[in-house]
Amino acid sequence: GHAIHSYLSNKTQNPIDANYVIFVAEVASTFNEALLMEDLLKKTNDKKERVFLINHFLDQFKGTLYRQTMFAEFELNIGRMVAEGKTLTADILCAEYKRLNEMYYGPDMVVDDEIAMEWARIPHFYYNYYVFQYATGYSAAIALSRRILNEGEKAVAD
């Protein structure tokens, strides 16, 4: 998705205008991926391949929409803690991260204690608050791709 977006952006715009922000990058790349997925699903008659593709789409949905939203909430919550004058320790970060995992995945999911440390290995958390853009970009891309697939040229023209 990102490769096609970057290629077309660089090919059709001057270098000064060809760059883009994260949200636009996510919309464009996941939009292209959604169109590709639809095309692959239409072309296959193989049941195993179809199951694989649907599973891949659902994994993307979980990872991009659900998990990134949890990441954004983690960042928001710890940012609020700092604003309230609290000192962030590893224990506080671990407790908050585990609490969110339990909340997001629900009581029927077994959440191992070790998940509490996962926050420490996620590179997104070493940069400013931006992961919410993955979820919002994905949502916009899926909505746009559905519209184009359902309405065709009219949606493209709009």
Q: Where do the protein language model's features map onto the residues?
A:
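Contiguous, function-dense segments enriched for cysteine-driven chemistry
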Residues: 27
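Catalytic Zn2+-binding segment of zinc metalloproteases
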Residues: 1-13
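Short beta-alpha connecting loops at secondary-structure transitions
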Residues: 12-21, 53-60, 79-85, 122
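C-terminal, non-catalytic "cap/extension" segments appended to globular domains
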Residues: 4-7, 23, 31-35, 42, ...
